[in-house]
Amino acid sequence: MRNLKTYLSVAPVVSTLWFGSLAGLLIEINRLFPDALIFPFFSL
């Protein structure tokens, strides 16, 4: 039961940090490459 309480207290913190960093990364990508729906990596 103690392990379950530890898991339930750690999981929201880890998921908040993960989604916060992911949102920050997406914001910075959209700031550097605005309106890039398709990255033209494969266009020759």
Curated annotation (Swiss-Prot):
A Gene Ontology BP annotation from the UniProt entry: photosynthesis
Coiled coil start-end: none
Subcellular localization: Plastid, Chloroplast thylakoid membrane
Keywords on record: Chloroplast, Membrane, Photosynthesis, Photosystem I, Plastid, Thylakoid, Transmembrane, Transmembrane helix
Predominant cellular place of this UniProt entry's protein: plastid
Membrane topology type: Single-pass membrane protein
Gene Ontology CC terms, in alphabetical order: chloroplast thylakoid membrane; photosystem I
Keyword Acetylation assigned: no
Transmembrane residue ranges: 7-27
PANTHER family reported for this sequence: PHOTOSYSTEM I REACTION CENTER SUBUNIT IX (PTHR36082:SF2), PTHR36082
Family: Belongs to the PsaJ family.
HAMAP family: PSI_PsaJ (MF_00522)
Function: May help in the organization of the PsaE and PsaF subunits.
Protein name (database record): Photosystem I reaction center subunit IX
The species this protein was found in: Morus indica
Gene for this chain: psaJ
